[in-house]
UniProtKB/Swiss-Prot annotation:
InterPro entries: BUD31 (IPR001748). GO terms for biological process: mRNA cis splicing, via spliceosome; mRNA splicing, via spliceosome. Involved in mRNA splicing where it associates with cdc5 and the other cwf proteins as part of the spliceosome. The lineage of its organism: Eukaryota, Fungi, Dikarya, Ascomycota, Taphrinomycotina. This is Pre-mRNA-splicing factor cwf14.
């Protein structure tokens, strides 16, 4: 969740006004998801939050690296204010992790067998009738070769 802006915090850099409506929309959708948490397991309830977090980070990543629409100063400010996940973006820049859905899917310490999540396995290596759904974030497959 982004930090609150008060009178004591630094003003956002130039260009923030152009992307602020989209970031506010992401923030409103996050609040809506948090308020409508229903029944189900913990991971099923957290999956929409992980997906929206991924979308917001991907939006900022695309603005800076793909479209080059924002300045370095604004990009660093957005990361510092927690509008995007800097660690996830750092992984997206590495080969093989371009489509990574969340950091939990590559952490081997949190899995039963000490391996990565099933969503990281390429679909060509799985059976055709096998349905892949991540237990952490609800991803349907984020291997870079898919």
């Amino acid at each position: 969740m982004p930090r609150l802006r008060t009178s004591r915090t630094k003003r956002p850099p130039d260009g923030f006004d152009e992307i602020e409506p989209t970031l506010i929309e992401f923030q409103d959708r996050m609040r809506q998801i948090e308020n409508t948490m229903g029944k189900g397991t913990k991971t099923e309830m957290l999956a929409p939050i992980f997906q929206l977090h991924h979308q917001r980070s991907r939006y900022i990543y695309d603005l800076y690296y793909k479209r080059e629409a924002i300045s370095t100063e604004l990009y660093n400010w957005l990361l510092k204010q927690n509008y995007a996940d800097g660690n996830l973006i750092a992984k997206w820049k590495k080969p093989g992790y371009e489509k990574l859905c969340c950091l939990r899917c590559i952490q081997t310490a949190e899995s039963k067998f000490g391996s990565t999540c099933i969503c990281r396995v390429p679909k060509s290596k799985l059976d055709k009738d096998q349905r892949v759904r991540c237990t952490h974030c609800g991803c349907n497959g984020c291997a870079s070769c898919d």
